Amino acid sequence: MDGLRQRFERFLEQKNVATDALGALEARTGVEKRYLAAGALTLLGLYLLFGYGASLLCNVIGFVYPAYASVKAIESPNKEDDTVWLTYWVVYALFGLVEFFSDLLLFWFPFYYAGKCAFLLFCMTPGPWNGALLLYHRVIRPLFLKHHVALDSAASQLSGRALDIAAGITRDVLQALARGRTLVTPASASESPAALEPDPKSSQTTLLKHK
């Protein structure tokens, strides 16, 4: 328990958007950052348990700040933070895939969204206890190194088939357009210019009748 509290306090001493906001509140209210953070986490947990729109709030927490931090990482000259947030998005994508198939079952658990939010916060926690980095190096990376050759081969075959299908569809469309143009051309060509010119004899006959 003491180790968890020490990690929590070390996190509050780091420089990021959350700690900057807590520092501003501490300066205005006189309440220490750790109490403000504990209160905010308690309110968040209660809302995720009993509040309306817990799913939306959980997805916002798991997406908005990481997206903001990812843009900052792209614009910064340091590439270490790029690796951190790329790792987070890999874990986030796999978690979303698993959640898609298990959501119908897990949705009915009362602590589902609170647990999901806690997991996402754990994955984006800066420092050596970053959950995304731990999951990547202990679970995802070993599986990837073991199966990446087969995955690359399957992806190459799928991309080749997709290109063949696209080429076949394009060829069929062009052939259909060519057949349609062939059917239209003889009908228009049958109306020769000679047939469209007025007959001089008929014109003269019409003038004599009027006289």
Curated annotation (Swiss-Prot):
Stretches for region Disordered: 188-211
Keywords: Cytoplasmic vesicle, Endoplasmic reticulum, Membrane, Transmembrane, Transmembrane helix
Subcellular location: Endoplasmic reticulum membrane; Cytoplasmic vesicle, Clathrin-coated vesicle membrane
Membrane topology of this protein: Multi-pass membrane protein
Bias (Polar residues): 201-211
One GO-annotated biological process of the protein: detection of light stimulus involved in visual perception
InterPro entries in the cross-refs: TB2_DP1_HVA22 (IPR004345)
Residue stretches of biased makeup (Low complexity): 188-197
One GO CC annotation: endoplasmic reticulum membrane
Record function comment: Required for correct function and survival of retinal photoreceptors. Required for retinal development. In rod photoreceptors, facilitates stability and/or trafficking of guanylate cyclases and is required to maintain endoplasmic reticulum and mitochondrial homeostasis. May play a role in clathrin-coated intracellular vesicle trafficking of proteins from the endoplasmic reticulum to the retinal rod plasma membrane.
Family according to the record: Belongs to the DP1 family.
Listed PANTHER family: HVA22-LIKE PROTEINS (PTHR12300), RECEPTOR EXPRESSION-ENHANCING PROTEIN 6 (PTHR12300:SF133)
Name of this chain's protein: Receptor expression-enhancing protein 6
Species this protein is from: Rattus norvegicus (Rat)
